[in-house]
């Protein structure tokens, strides 16, 4: 996601290193951004519908109305649902594409070379993916951050989510420097 952009803003030497692949990453980030946009639409429409099915009246109109506690509840439900169902798969796929770009030396060739999914998935650092990416960033950053996102008007949600990605990247880069 754009968290990588934020971290790269803090660690400039990394993206200047041969093989980082700024151009292929930009293409992948664009495609991933469309995936995030799709997920935000699907979950922001589907979760309120499900809440209505389960008995909450007017959840679909509440999420698009003025701020109130019910709107906060619906926004939290959308965020938790989206980040529990979609984010782990999305984050893992993002890691796979980053690894593939690095494995191809950062060249544009990475965009047309088949991704060796089995090899990359087998060699992922699942300890870090589970214990940090999933168990820490999702509940402690993305749940609250996307709750705020879904409180905003629909037309600014994707932009705000992109900014949050940059903020997370900056925070992760600062934390990595302190280690």
Model-identified regions with their sequence ranges:
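Membrane-helix boundary/juxtamembrane motif in polytopic membrane proteins
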Residues: 105-136
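Membrane-interface interhelical connector segments
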Residues: 47-72, 105-116
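Hydrophobic, membrane-inserted alpha-helices
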Residues: 140-149
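Alpha-helical membrane-spanning segments of integral membrane proteins, especially the hydrophobic core
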Residues: 21-34, 63-86
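Single conserved hydrophobic/aromatic residue that forms the stacking wall/gate
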Residues: 1-6, 11
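Alpha-helical transmembrane segments and their membrane-interface exit regions
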Residues: 7-8, 165-176
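Membrane-interface helix-boundary motifs at transmembrane edges
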Residues: 13-23
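Transmembrane alpha-helix/helix-exit interface in multi-pass inner-membrane proteins
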Residues: 33-54, 75-108
């Amino acid at each position: 996601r754009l968290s990588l952009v934020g971290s790269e803003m803090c660690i400039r030497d990394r993206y200047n290193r041969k093989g980082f692949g700024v151009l292929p990453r930009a293409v992948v980030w664009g495609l991933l951004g469309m995936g995030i946009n799709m997920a935000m639409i699907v979950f922001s429409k589907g979760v309120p519908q499900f809440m209505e099915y389960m008995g909450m009246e007017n959840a679909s109109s509440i999420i698009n109305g003025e701020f109130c506690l019910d709107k906060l509840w619906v926004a939290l439900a959308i965020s938790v649902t989206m980040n529990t169902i979609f984010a782990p798969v999305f984050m893992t796929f993002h890691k796979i594409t980053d690894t593939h770009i690095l494995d191809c030396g950062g060249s544009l060739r990475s965009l047309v070379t088949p991704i060796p999914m089995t090899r990359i998935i087998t060699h992922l650092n699942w300890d870090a993916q589970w214990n940090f990416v999933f168990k820490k960033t999702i509940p402690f950053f993305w749940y609250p951050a996307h709750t705020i996102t879904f409180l905003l008007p629909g037309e600014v949600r994707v932009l705000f989510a992109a900014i949050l990605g940059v903020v997370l990247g900056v925070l992760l880069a600062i934390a990595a420097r302190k280690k």
